[in-house]
Amino acid sequence: MIADDVPEPLAAGENIRTALDEWIAAKGYVRPGLSLESLAREVGCNRSYLSRYVNSELGLNFKLWIRALRIAESQRLLLEHPGASALEVGEMVGIHGRSTFFAQFSEVTGMSPGEYRRRYAGGDPIAPSQE
């Protein structure tokens, strides 16, 4: 996604949960350089409010929440695009660098992207970390 593709900010009065659900559905979390400040602007609230909301409602800090969204998307992509390398999948979800992607993927799932692909490519359900 390039900078010109950034969606217009949502109306300030819109419910933050609805705004975040729409942002997640649009896969806004895959954009490189995503920050708490940029997301707050997109959903029409201030940085502090968004941070408190994510911490209290989702039980994660902002960086861990974005990481979880990106890894969940990478799990889907690994299975849907068997010809894509792990590096390509990492870049598709906004995680740049092979070692960074492998480290984050392994931390969240407990296995490497290749192990995940081998284990679940046969149509088994998504890994337990996503249930």
Residue spans for each PLM region:
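Terminal helix-turn-helix DNA-binding modules in bacterial transcription factors
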Residues: 56-93, 119-131
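Basic, amphipathic alpha-helical hairpins
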Residues: 20-34, 54, 58, 75-84, ...
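…primarily DNA-binding HTH/wHTH and HhH modules…
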Residues: 3, 7, 103-131
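Short, Lys/Arg-enriched, Trp-marked, Pro/Gly-tolerant hinge/linker segments that flank
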Residues: 1-18, 29, 56, 60-61
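Sequence-specific DNA-binding recognition helix
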Residues: 81-117
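Central "turn" residue of the DNA-binding helix-turn-helix
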Residues: 41-44, 94-96
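HTH DNA-binding helix-turn interface
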Residues: 51-65, 105-113
